[in-house]
Amino acid sequence: VRARAQGYPMDDAACTLETDDENLKAVFELCRHTIRVGVQEGYLDCPTREKGEYSGDLAVTSLAQVYLSGDTRLLRKAIEDWLYSANLTPGLLAVFPSAFQQRIADYSLLMPEVALRDYAHTGDKAFLRRTCDAAGALLKVFEAYAREDGLLEKVVEGWNLVDWPANLRDEYDFPLTLPIGEGCHNVINAFYIGAVRA
């Protein structure tokens, strides 16, 4: 019997945890191993099912991967691919590179924050300027849905995803139908505020 293991190369000395708490050590090692084997040539939470990077996975996983490895190359490539999707829609795609042109409004709004993450680790002002141009175009897309008070309503620029099972939504009962229901959807507005602040 043979098995082949592969993963993104990581220097274990790039990020260490000093604690006497054995449970915390175990959690840290589990997280490190998860990033090592779960991050391959892209940020995929299920490489056997997903054939492109989802920007939501990128936003979460890159945070841990960059701190654990000190390596920003994969993050930069993912942002480049994400920005390239603006050639198809200024609202950005949720999956890239991919022929599957899915738009998830919430995920698109993560781009400015992820771009700032790259800058925080690289200090690359030229790349930050490029991402600022894309972020400006992205925010213009969403400003079209702004009410008088600045909150967004009836955002139809892609799917409004609340990635929680219905039984775990803590009675959040906003109609997440396609197209989105009437009213002010808190989740998309939280992402929008985060994008504007970034």
Task: For each feature predicted by the language model, list its residue ranges.
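Active-site acid/base region of carbohydrate-active enzymes
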Residues: 5-30, 36, 43-92, 121-187
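Hydrophobic alpha-helical segments with strong N-terminal bias
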Residues: 44-47, 97, 108
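Aromatic/His-enriched, Gly/Pro-containing loop or helix-boundary segments
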Residues: 94-103
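Generic alpha-helical secondary structure signal
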Residues: 26, 30, 77, 106, ...
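Short glycine/serine- and small hydrophobic-enriched flexible loop segments
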Residues: 63-67, 113-120, 194-198
